[in-house]
Design a protein with these regions (language model features):
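Extended beta-strand solenoid/passenger and fiber regions
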Residues: 1-67, 72-87, 96-103
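Acidic glycine-/aspartate-rich tracts in secreted/extracellular proteins
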Residues: 83-85, 147-151, 211-213
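Extracellular Ig-like/FN3 beta-sandwich strand-entry sites
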Residues: 86-90, 139, 164-166
Length: 228
């Protein structure tokens, strides 16, 4: 893989509140009749009701279904079994709420760290006297440095703490080609630095909440949207 200039990166976040869907949104079949991706909006609000429907032809006979898993941060529907062509292979979301994202202006650097946690489960007489460890959970934290002084993330922090909301984050390393990390997160800290002979700066720290995705294209498919 060739080097990528850091200038190609970016940071995007959602803002509260989410927006209720005004009309049904179609979903694109990945080709296996199991994985479908929402056609227009990527990030959906997990605190709001979502209704998924199937149709035999995409225009009539829409019926609400519940035999699926929905991956909210990327708008992916995964059905328990493949849809049948001519019976129920057209899919749409008839009710739900989505997040609107925009660039965190002034952002100039981001740094993330993924960790896997383990638990020592070494028994007596362990082979070779080696410790035995069990993988438990994964976590991700990240920070963003900005040339900005405003309350955008501070407001989101207040909203999430009071109402139990969430923020959708995109950490791009190659925005032009759609390459980024995408996930829900909660802000954990905000610091500001004002120096007379420098520019105003703001640093933001956040913690991922739920699955983290690597996305390698703006065209979503089972090969370009990867859950870590």
């Amino acid at each position: 893989m060739s080097a990528i200039a850091g200038i190609n990166g970016d940071v995007w976040t959602s803002t509260s509140p989410s927006t209720a869907l005004g009309s049904s949104e179609s979903c694109t079949d990945s080709g296996n009749h199991i994985n479908y991706f929402t056609a227009t909006h990527q990030a959906w609000d997990p605190t709001q009701t979502l209704t998924v429907q199937n149709s035999p032809n995409g225009s009539t006979g829409w019926a609400t279904v519940t035999d699926y898993v929905f991956y909210w941060p990327v708008g992916e529907i995964v059905f328990n079994t493949a849809r049948s062509v001519g019976t129920n292979n057209f899919t749409r979301i008839s009710a739900g709420s989505y997040f609107t994202l925009s660039a965190l202006d002034g952002a100039h650097a981001w740094k993330m760290s993924v960790k896997g946690m383990t638990k020592d489960v070494t028994p007596f007489q362990a082979s070779g006297s080696w410790a035995v460890n069990l993988a438990t959970i994964k976590s991700m934290t990240f920070s963003v440095d900005c040339f900005r002084q405003d309350g955008r993330i501070l407001t989101e922090m207040g909203t999430t703490n009071i109402s139990g909301g969430i923020i959708l984050c995109q950490l791009w390393w190659d925005e032009a080609n759609g390459k980024r990390w995408q996930f829900y997160a909660l802000p954990t800290g905000i610091s500001q630095n004002i120096v007379a002979n420098d520019v105003d700066k703001q640093s933001i720290n956040m913690q991922a909440s739920g699955p983290v995705y690597i996305i390698t294209s703006n065209t979503f498919s089972t090969t370009t949207v990867i859950q870590e």
